[in-house]
Amino acid sequence: VTFSKASSKTDDERANPKRANLRTKPYVLERYLEVKPGEVLEGKNIESTMKEMYRTGIFNRIEPNITGSETDPNARNVEFLIEERPTTTINGSISYGTAVGLVGGLKLSDDNFLGRDQQAAINLEASNKGDKTFSIDWFDPWIKNTERVQAGGSAYWRESRDDDADWDELEKVKTIGTRWTIGKGLNKDIY
C-alpha cells in the first residue's frame, strides 16, 4: 500500500519537485488505513479507508489504483492517489457593537499544521474602545501512537476597559491564561 500525490500540474506550468510530495506525513495516512499488507484485498476496506481519510477534511480527492504484482500473481498493489486541499487561511473581520465599539480582527489558521492533521491558529482582535485580545490555539485530533487520544490548548492575553471603574480605580483589566483539553475519540463506526 502506497500513497502518492495526484498530479495537478497544468501544461503551461513547470514541474516543481517540492509539489511532487504530499504535505501530509505518512503516519497520518497510515492510521486511517483499513487495507493491510498481506491480508485479502476487499472493496469495503478500500471504501472505509477513503471514507476515514475524507472525514479529516484535508483532502479534495482520493483515488485507489490497484495493480498486479510482477512477482506474485495473487498479490495486489494498492496505490492511493491523493489531492490535498489548501488548509491555510487568513481571515479579517470588522464589526461594530454598542458595548465594544468598532472591532477589527485578523486570524491565521492551518488545519493540517506541519502535515500532521493538527489545527493551529493565531488570532488578534482590537477595538477602538481599548479592548484587545491575542490568542494562540493548537489541537491534535489523534496524537501519534495512541488509540485516538486528542489534545489541545490555547494561550491568550486579553485587555479590556472597565467602564464601571471610578476615577481612582484601575481602568484596564488584563487577563492572561490558558485553556487545555484532552479527550478520547470514539471508534470509526460511531457516527
PLM ranges: what are they?
Residues T2-E13, N187-Y191:
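Short, intrinsically disordered, charge-balanced linker/junction segments flanking boundaries
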Residues L22-R23, E39-Y191:
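Gram-negative/organellar outer-membrane beta-barrel architecture
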Residues S8-V35:
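N-terminal periplasmic "start-of-domain" segments of outer-membrane beta-barrel proteins
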Residues V1, K5, E83-P86:
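Conserved catalytic cores of ATP-dependent inositol ring kinases
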